[in-house]
Structure formats: structure tokens, C-alpha cells
């Protein structure tokens, strides 16, 4: 297991637990104002007592203080909903005494290490990125058949001899978790790849074509071809420690680089084959309100399609990257025994094929969690603001914005993880960039021109052309969010001002956009057309936005 997945089991009312932290000897019965959390890590369970009045941030900090699990590596889930608003109290989410929370922790984030010997033999294994080269040598000696002892090894990376104290994570700075190493010592010819990477005959990956009249762009064809080559050459998918769903890094034919990222529908959070052991959704609702389990892949593809380049619509532009820089994404079906098959892999590639999104792997220097937001270029932040507002993103945080460099050396922000875009309502819209200084600066003229070029009706038609029978509630969300963005720039509002209209201040207080929608709904007859309803939304929105400019 590469992730410590914590499924917290219900307890009986007479159970004893530690008060105020983990592993303490004090024994007490919980009160009606208390919440018991059982963390199961590596086979052991650790109880913790919190109060209903605690904020989510306080609970996470207490977990970090008591057991060292860093706050930013924690995700709390209750009753099928992520407790994402750190300033809100646990009771705002409906948590009461005796409730059971689910915690997912990322404790182990491995790198796939490829060792190539002087005689050309190849060996692969996973190494914790926090380990050093000395540890790597011990692993080579212990696990590699015929490899030399530690003292006889000399390891190089890109021609540079590596010191034993060098940290593995610091060697590979471009975000690619495959390190190519050379062992400068003769090794027996019996060294081979591990058996499970020797052949790709039981694997499958192919595009899902929903409309035969739509030709797959060359960039997506190339990404799929390179991914298939990797599988056929025996380079297995590598499960990522990131996220609450199944995410697999797909390698190229050399096994030295990642090409793409595969997210199966049936392994999404709260789906039936979710590898994180989160409970299966009882009503089909996703972790974010207004989304459904199993629809994340469709939304990932939609995000790329609607990220139009400055030069024009995605359907006619030849540019690979759009305005916001969403990586190229396609719908595929794939099978491999590395994926999560609770009932076992049958070795029948077609039978066990999973449908999901395949997104181009982007070289990066980490995420925005690793850098203070003050260092980000204003235009890079604003492009993400525009995208998130328009798509009503319900899951934008610093961890799903990667940082990179352009060919000219300029800082780039790369938005990923769009499975919770275009929800059916605005209840869970969250934009972390609201708290960044760039969000309080006005949009540039170029960005305003781009915003004014957007057309929600064309966007809906484009999604339908690519095979998504867009639910009416989703179409309405896109129409209203696009309307808000355009009306906002007409009034010279900043990203912060527009984004604040979409986001709730607390869990139980409706956002301004929700109030606008409700006002419009109450002002029209039940049988009114969508056009009539949207006109009512426009009137209510004008009044609310005008108040912001007074």
C-alpha cells in the first residue's frame, strides 16, 4: 500500500477512548457534544475526542499535533462529503456526538526507480522520495539478484555521481517520478525486470469514441499511442499517492518518463472500486454537492474541451493548450492488473477494461502548496480565476495547481483535477485563490477580451458534439457562471469580488449566487421557459452586482 487509508469504524456507546489525543491512558465515555474519530493506520486504531464546536482546521491541527500527520496531507470525509471548509465547525457539516469521520492520509509518496546496469539489465522498484542514495544502494543490494554489495556500488544520474546522503526527491526536480540510475559494477546476466513488468500482453488502452464524426486531435492520439507503447513494453502503471481516488501514472516505452495520468470512473471517491476504502455513496452523490459518483472523468474531459485557446474555440483552434492551460485530456478504456480489482484480475484485457479519463502528464516543480502565492505572476493566477468561475469549480485548492516553467523560464501555473467542475448547483464552489493577493487586482485588457468571447450556448453544443448528454442542471450552471463572469468584468470587478459571489462564507450560509438563483426561481411561474428563468437571473444579478460597485 502506498497510502495510509483510514476508514474509521463505528464504535459502541460503552467503548473507551483516549481523551484529547492519541494513545493516552485516560478512559472516559463521550458526551453528546463529542465526536469520536477512530484512525486506522497500518493495522492499528487510535481514538481521538473532539468537540462539535471545533473547526475543521482545529481538528486537523489536533491530528497533526498528536500523531504528526501534516494538516495539508489530511482529508476528512463525513456522510459522503469532504469537510473542505477549514473555518467551518464540524457541527456545521452535521457531525454530532458519536458520528464517525473518515480520514485519508498520504503518508508514502513513492518514486519509481529504474536501475540500468553496465551490461544493460534493468530492474525497477519503488523508493520513498524522502530516502537518500545510501538507502537506495541497500535496496539494490538486497532486492537485486546478482547486484553488488553497497561498498562496490557507484550510482550516477545524468552523468553525476551521487553522494550517499543525497535525498532522492531532490535528484528529480521536474516532477517526473522515474529516476534513471547507472550501477557502475558488473552484474550477472540473470538480472531481469520484475515479472509483473515483463510483458504488456494482459493490458489494454484505447480511446472511447462517442461520436465517430469527431476526430481525435493529434496531440491526444500521440499521448494515447505513447501510453500504449509503454504498456506493451512492460512499463506498468504506477499508482499515485495523491488524491482520494484511484490515480495511475502511465509510463512510456523506456520506463523512464511519465506520459499520462489515468483515472478510472469506478475508482473515483466513493465509487464501488475506490482503492482508498472510502464508503460507497448511498445515493450516488459525489464528495462535492451537485456531482455524481462516476462522472468525474466526463468532467475532466469537459474541462479540457471548454478551455478554449485565445485564438478561438477548441473545436476549430489548432493550439494544444487553452487559455488556462488545462492539460490535454481524453476518455479511454484500459485494463491492467495494477488497477484496483477487488474480485481479482481475470487476465482478460477486454473483460476487465475500466473507462476513465487520460490526461497528459505535465512536468512540474511541485504544486502551489509548496510556494507562497506572492511569487505567482498575476496573469497566471487570473487565467485560473477565469476558468474556475466559469466552470463553477467545487474543488480548487493549492494542491491541484502545479507550478512549472515556460521555455523562456517564466513561472507557469498548471490547473489539474477537474472532476468536480460544472456541478448541478453552486453549493460547494471553493476557490483557494480568493485569499491570494493577485485576486484583488483587476483583469488585464487581454483577459477581458477573452472573457467577452465566451459563449455558454456554444460550449454546451461542443460538449454534446463530443458525446456528453449534458444534464439541464449542468447547462444552467454553465450559463449562469458565464453570465456572472461577463457581467463582473463589465463593472470592472476583480476576480476576488466575482469569486466571492460564488463561494459560501460558511457551510450553512448560502452564497450570493445561490440567493440570486433562488430569487429568480421565486419570481417566475413554474412552467416558465429556461430563457425566461435566465432573464430573471440576469435582473437579480444586475441588482446584486451593482451593489458591489456603489
Curated annotation (Swiss-Prot):
GO BP annotation list: negative regulation of plant-type hypersensitive response; protein stabilization; response to salt stress; root development
EC number: 2.7.1.67
One Pfam match: PI3_PI4_kinase
Positions that bind ATP: 241-247, 263, 359-362, 417
Keywords noted in UniProt: ATP-binding, Kinase, Membrane, Nucleotide-binding, Repeat, Transferase
GO cellular component entries: cytoplasm; membrane; nucleus; plant-type vacuole
SMART domains assigned to the protein according to its UniProt record, in alphabetical order: UBQ
Compartments (UniProt record): Membrane
The protein, known as: Phosphatidylinositol 4-kinase gamma 2
